[in-house]
Design a protein with these regions (language model features):
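Phosphate/pyrophosphate-binding loop motifs in nucleotide- or prenyl diphosphate-using proteins
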Residues: 1-195
Length: 195
């Protein structure tokens, strides 16, 4: 397998199907950001796996994150595919799977009414970093839509839920590790319908 092609030396790449585009094309920006999100998640997975205490407490979440990496690659593949060239890989089942995970975890969390400032533990903060990186990916995907480029709308739903998942898992991580959340002191009550 040849890693370098020299094709990108002039600032261009190819989408699925062969269309030549600039490396600053909205699709390339979106799937490049997806790759960043997936890579950052790999750091979290490795850190949990390598720390016996973390793996004991967060092993299930680590396994979920490994599955999420697979789903992120499906999302990236769909983003690299101009609309209609092939069937999309990401499905509504991926969205439902994330919702089921959150529905399982949210009842375990203490009542939350205000904004949370990332902290409490390094791992919780890493999940909040995942949340914000995922929101960045979501904005890049919206830019693809605004550029009149067709995308898998299920992928956008998935990324929206994924950010929520990382928020929930960040809070759950602090709970499981015995750390308190840092509440934004000037926050109005915003989660009125939460547990």
């Amino acid at each position: 397998m040849k890693i370098y092609t020299k094709y990108g030396d002039e600032g261009f790449t190819r989408l699925y199907g062969g269309q030549r585009v600039s490396k600053t094309h909205v699709r390339v920006e979106a799937y490049g950001t997806m790759d960043e999100v997936c890579s950052l998640l790999g750091v979290i997975i490795a850190e949990i796996r390598e720390d016996e205490k973390l793996n004991d407490v967060l092993g299930k979440i680590r396994e979920e994150c490994e599955n999420i990496q697979q789903q992120l690659f499906d999302c990236g593949s769909d983003l690299a595919t101009p609309d209609g060239l092939r069937e999309y890989k990401q499905t509504i089942d991926d969205v439902k799977w994330l919702e089921e995970r959150m529905d399982e975890y949210i009842p375990q969390l203490p009542k939350l009414e205000c904004f949370v400032i990332p902290g409490g533990s390094r791992m919780s903060s890493m999940f909040h970093l995942m949340r914000t990186s995922t929101r960045s990916l979501e904005r890049k995907m919206i830019a693809v839509i605004e550029a009149n480029e067709g995308i898998n709308k299920v992928g956008l739903q998935y990324i929206n839920r994924l950010s929520d998942y990382f928020f929930v898992v960040g809070c759950l991580t602090n709970l499981k590790l015995g750390n308190n959340e840092t509440i934004y002191k000037r926050s109005a009550k915003i989660f009125r319908n939460s547990k």
